[in-house]
């Protein structure tokens, strides 16, 4: 499996009050990104500071909605350790969706390693309160900058 390069955020965001969490409102300090092209496959795996994505205006995701997403949770156990809820099931569903819309499947070991490393790096975002969790939203988008119906 390829190495995942980590670039830490220089400034950390203020964490929300765990008693007032709102789904989808707060983003962690980092994100996991991997590039793909036919020649190299999935490459340049990295965890970087959370930031907007730069997308070509002709990207497939914008014109043909070529994208998929999944969702899983990281939560704290009674002893304070962090667990992911069924991460391999999540990765398999992600790849099944990729197959269905002709996006390249992400190697399972790479996806799991990226999610795991991201949660380790941003572990202070996983709340301690009962019935709370950190929601993780893996997604794959078609970025091929061409118009016309074909795979990205």
Report each predicted region and the residues it spans:
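Conserved alpha/beta cores of soluble small-molecule-handling proteins
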Residues: 1-152
């Amino acid at each position: 499996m390829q190495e995942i390069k980590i670039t830490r955020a220089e400034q950390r965001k203020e964490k929300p009050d765990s008693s007032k969490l709102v789904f989808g409102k707060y983003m962690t300090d980092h994100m996991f990104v991997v590039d793909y092209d036919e020649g190299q496959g999935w490459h340049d795996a990295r965890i970087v500071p959370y930031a907007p994505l730069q997308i070509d205006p002709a990207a497939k995701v914008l014109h043909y909605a070529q994208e998929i997403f999944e969702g899983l949770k990281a939560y704290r156990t009674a002893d304070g350790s962090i667990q992911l809820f069924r991460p391999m099931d999540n990765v398999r569903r992600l790849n099944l969706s990729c197959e269905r819309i002709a996006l390249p499947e992400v190697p399972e070991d790479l996806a799991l390693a990226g999610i795991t490393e991201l949660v380790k790096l941003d572990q202070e975002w996983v709340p301690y309160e009962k019935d709370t969790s950190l929601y993780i939203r893996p997604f794959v988008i078609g970025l091929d900058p061409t118009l016309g119906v074909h795979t990205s």
